[in-house]
Amino acid sequence: MTQTTRSVPTAFEITRRENCFQGFYKLDKLYLRHELFDGGTSKEISRELFVRHDAVCVLPYDAKRDEVVLIEQFRVGAVQKTGNPWLIELVAGLIDKDEQPEEVAHREAEEEAGLVFGALWPITKYFPSPGGSDEFVHLFMGQCDSQGAGGLHGLESEGEDIRVTVWSFDDAMQAVADGRIINAATIIALQWLALNRAEIRGLWS
């Protein structure tokens, strides 16, 4: 990578913001200018922004058995891109106002998978699609007992129909390699576990 001594741009100005749609999610149109890498300022540009709650995703891991607990559910976003919109995913949920990410992790583990976490390990935080969305993801690993995990879960009031499955670590990684797991947070979390598995097993076993 070519190194440069030029400073990174930091200045921007939002000149106008319009709401285009308001439902469970929101779509806004922003008009803005921002500093350029050459030191100048851009002309006014417009960008559509998908506004949504920040999210928490958790990989439940039983270090003693070297097993992960994953969920499957129907995802409307995958309807037109794949022949099977039932995706293999992590336990996940949206952060409500005044909630801490850790609270969401524990709540969703119980609601979506019937699990109680003994501890949480922060993996990373990231923007999944910052070119058009402000969603920010908090990614954790949760210490769990996988024995007896499984079955159908989810809140009927939210239309959730969730199947919980237990995987050996090796089988889960093979599902990533085979393209059966195509959810980004799940892939990131499993690859992180692959890099840190020995340490985690030493601490949580």
Please place each PLM-identified region on the residue numbering.
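Conserved Nudix-box catalytic region and its N-terminal flanking loop in Nudix hydrolases
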Residues: R47-F50, E67-R107, H153-E158, I162
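Short, well-ordered beta-strand micro-motif
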Residues: K29-Y31, P60, M141-Q143, V166-S168
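Acidic, metal-coordinating catalytic segment for phosphate/diphosphate chemistry
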Residues: C20-R65
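Acidic/glycine-rich phosphate/pyrophosphate-binding loops and surrounding catalytic core
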Residues: V116-W121, F127-P128
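Nudix hydrolase/Nudix homology domain
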Residues: T2-V8, F12, R16, E72, ...
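Active-site-adjacent beta-strand/loop module that shapes the phosphate/pyrophosphate-binding cleft
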Residues: L32-L36, S129-G150
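Acidic pyrophosphate-coordinating catalytic loop
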Residues: N19-G23, G39, V79-K81, Y126-H138
